[in-house]
Amino acid sequence: MTTLFISDLHLTPSRTDITECFVQFMRNEAVNAEALYVLGDLFEFWIGDEDCTPFAERIRNEFKALTTSGVPVYFIQGNRDFLLGQRFCRETGITLLDDVCTIDLYGEKVVILHGDTLCIDDLKYQEFRKTVHQRWLQWIFKRIPWFIKKRIVAKVQSGVRDDKQHKSLEIMDVNQQEVAQVMSQFCVKLMIHGHTHRPNIHHFEHDNLPLTRIVLGDWYSQGSVLKVTADGYSLEQRPFFTE
């Protein structure tokens, strides 16, 4: 059997190529998997579980069809879909996991997370993350009218784009010491995460122990899937479908 991992799809109505690749993946690959893990940023931005647009319903239906077929789906919130909550999970049958958690992957303990919490050198982002994850603020936001939410999100997205233009790639990448600290904290030799859009498999040592960090790819120009079996793992690409 195969366990699949994806992240950073940034699904949005304007990118039909990404959506179609995702749908084909769900129907042709994920349906045959032992489990599917989505490690955040499934959406370009998820405003709230009350989203009932045709696009949101289409994505819900794909997950519902997959879980109904018997394939468990596990989700970790990313920095763009941290408002995805229990209502979405109930409607689709997926399971929401903690921001950082460990799983048993064919006999090996593995730590999985979105990855933004590893980018501790980006102080401005970490402060922003701390703010938007406050429960009282999310409680208020969930009760704001939909049209106002959209305006707020549009303004935030504009600010994020402007901010990124003035940051170095190093600041937006993970901090290696933080990676080692988290792996040591959870007593694991393998970490899987997304967020940085830098797909790769990193092998390194810490305290004389061989460690591995797998970085999932984004879906901006092609699909990216991590396939794990009892025999090993492979980070693979999936081409977009063209007319």
Swiss-Prot record:
Binding site for Mn(2+) 2: 41, 79, 114, 195
Cellular localization per UniProt: Cell inner membrane
Binding site for Mn(2+) 1: 8, 10, 41, 197
GO cellular component: cytoplasm; extrinsic component of plasma membrane
Reaction catalyzed: UDP-2-N,3-O-bis[(3R)-3-hydroxytetradecanoyl]-alpha-D-glucosamine + H2O = 2-N,3-O-bis[(3R)-3-hydroxytetradecanoyl]-alpha-D-glucosaminyl 1-phosphate + UMP + 2 H(+)
Membrane topology value: Peripheral membrane protein
GO BP terms, alphabetized: lipid A biosynthetic process
Pathway, per record: Glycolipid biosynthesis; lipid IV(A) biosynthesis; lipid IV(A) from (3R)-3-hydroxytetradecanoyl-[acyl-carrier-protein] and UDP-N-acetyl-alpha-D-glucosamine: step 4/6
Binding positions for substrate per the UniProt entry: 79-80, 122, 164, 167, 195
Protein name stated in the entry: UDP-2,3-diacylglucosamine hydrolase
Lineage of source species: Bacteria, Pseudomonadati, Pseudomonadota, Gammaproteobacteria, Vibrionales
